[in-house]
Amino acid sequence: MQLSSSLRSARSAAASSGCALASRPVVACRRVTPSVTRPGPFTIATGPLLPASRSKAGGGIRVFSSALYEFGQQLKEDLEHDLSRARVDAITNKTRIAELEQQRRILMAVGGMADDEPELKAALMQLEEILGVSFNELQLMLAETLADHPAKMDNLAAMAAVVGTGSDGGGDESGDRRTADAADADGDGDGGERAWLRFKADVRACLADLRNRKGGITLHRAIVKDMVSASSNPGARRSSSSVDKMAREELDRLMPFLLDDFLDNMPGLKAAFTGKAEPGAEGDDGEDEEEGEAQGVGEDAVDSSSGGSGGGGVLSCTAWQQVLGRTVPASSPTLALVLARGYLAMAPRQYRALALVRMILPGKTGGGVDGALTRKEGLSLLKKLRPGISGLADKDKQWLEWVIARLAAEFAVQPAGDGHEPEPKRPELPPTAVQREPPAEEQHKPTAGARDSPNM
């Protein structure tokens, strides 16, 4: 009895302790008796063993190959050798060019053939000083080539105008243009008056081309502001804010009126073309001085035999430099380049060449403003110079300018064709082919059956 009672008390104590353990949270049980898990089976990692920068195909992993190394070294040596030879050839060519230029100077000095046209480098320095533009070596070399071929240079300028404006380069058919053409056809009026009308028409055409360009409306609006502030006509007075609010159509209507007033009132500008003193000069001494200066220009102000801007002729270098000197200081910075483009067509060949080079090779200034070609327009010019050219989309700007310069130089020096498109080159014979000339008697008297001979 005593044994059974002790067993029952032990069971009750165990049951009570079991209930207490069962009522505890699972976490407490795990703390008391943590479970031991067995490790899983061995697996191979599927992720990259190398960092992301080196896990790509061939990234940072180099396999040494003696044949590949020798080939790379040989290719590097060949490229360095070709580059050195190209530099030597360039130095040789520049030396030869300097010698030929010196011989030409001596020949012109001895033969009395010197004229008033400056060398191209002197014209370049003048444009850089007055207009604030700059030229690199590539532009200078192309301008020198174009200046020696004025006819082909004008053809190239017409091609560039077509791709730049999308038109035939006719510009604005203003009343001045029609008056100048009529005077040329009838033979009326002197060369100075025709040159003055031609100049005004060319400036109008340049402003019309500027309006059609991307971003040209901003420069167009700035030019209108400058001419409004400089105008002495009360009817042309406009505030700067009112010009900012003008639409394109209103600017187009206001521009011709302002331009005529601006050009007519510019001191000494018309006299540089016509060679006649302007009425209303202040003081007798000033009038005599102005008249003498104008007469000095008017003696040879227009050289109609030099080509250029049509019947109006090309201004002599002295007259054109006076136009340049009088126009730029009196105009605004934005209008200066536009006016310069207007009479660059009437300028001597050196200035026309520099203007054309600035148009087709804009350099760091980009394109789309002041007549400079954009990249898309440059590609169009390349296709005109070389119709079969391809693979130009992925080329950079510097490569594009080099190709344009080379093809433009080739276009200038090649024989005259149709005046607009370069003549196709004759196919070159393969290196193994040998071209033989038949005897003189065979050239004039072919033998019988020669057409059927397999050797002919």
From Swiss-Prot:
Keyword Transmembrane helix applies: no
The entry's keywords: Signal
Positions with biased composition (Acidic residues): 281-293
Region (Disordered): 167-189, 273-310, 414-456
Bias (Basic and acidic residues): 418-428
KW Signal (keyword) present: yes
Signal peptide: 1-28
Listed name of the protein: Ezy-1 protein
Organism whose genome encodes this protein: Chlamydomonas reinhardtii
